[in-house]
């Protein structure tokens, strides 16, 4: 693949490649995760949950849940489409509410941070308009699974990193209040 930036070849003919189509990633050699990445929710679910709960008093959890879900120190591996899908599957959760409050009142959020990525990975992962999934996956199953992200019936805003955050339009007034109170930028 032209997007494989680093390749390791084995004697048996197999290859391990670092593929980064959109050039968001980086790779550092080492024996452990870097200090700014928490436990993987799909393979270290107990450690993942513990890491969040033991740090819930930190200032980072004062911010809206839709922003905190992108913090890899606590939500390792949760990216843009996964945060939209996780929050959408919690219809009573205002995605602009303080993360600490959301997590304390809705422990299912932490569970979904494990369940949703596992399901997405089992389906082979997503595909974007500018990136075709190289794994021969059932595109229709993944498209059915994605209910919120990039759905024209949903609302969206840009987060502090300039990424589109897709959310249920029932929360649009909450989004506008955040703008009025200068808590997020339009």
Describe the residue ranges of each PLM region.
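Residue-identity detector for threonine
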Residues: 14-15, 32, 42-43, 101, ...
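Acidic, proline/glycine-enriched N-terminal capping motif
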Residues: 1-38, 103-104, 165, 171-176, ...
């Amino acid at each position: 693949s032209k997007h494989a930036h680093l390749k390791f070849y084995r004697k048996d003919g197999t290859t391990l490649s670092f593929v980064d189509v959109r050039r968001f990633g980086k790779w550092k050699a080492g024996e452990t995760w870097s200090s700014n990445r928490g436990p993987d929710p799909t393979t270290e679910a107990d450690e993942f949950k513990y890491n969040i709960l033991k740090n819930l008093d930190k200032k980072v959890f004062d911010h809206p849940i839709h922003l905190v879900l992108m913090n890899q120190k606590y939500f390792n591996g949760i990216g843009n489409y996964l945060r939209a899908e996780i929050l959408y599957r919690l219809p009573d959760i205002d995605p602009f509410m303080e993360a600490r409050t959301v997590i304390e009142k809705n422990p299912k959020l932490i569970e979904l941070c494990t369940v949703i990525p596992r399901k997405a990975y089992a389906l082979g992962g997503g595909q974007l308009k500018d990136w075709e999934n190289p794994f021969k996956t059932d595109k229709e199953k993944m498209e059915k699974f994605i209910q919120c992200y990039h759905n024209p019936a949903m609302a969206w805003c840009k987060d502090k990193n300039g990424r589109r955050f897709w959310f249920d339009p029932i929360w649009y007034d909450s989004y506008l209040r955040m703008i009025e109170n200068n808590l997020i930028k339009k």
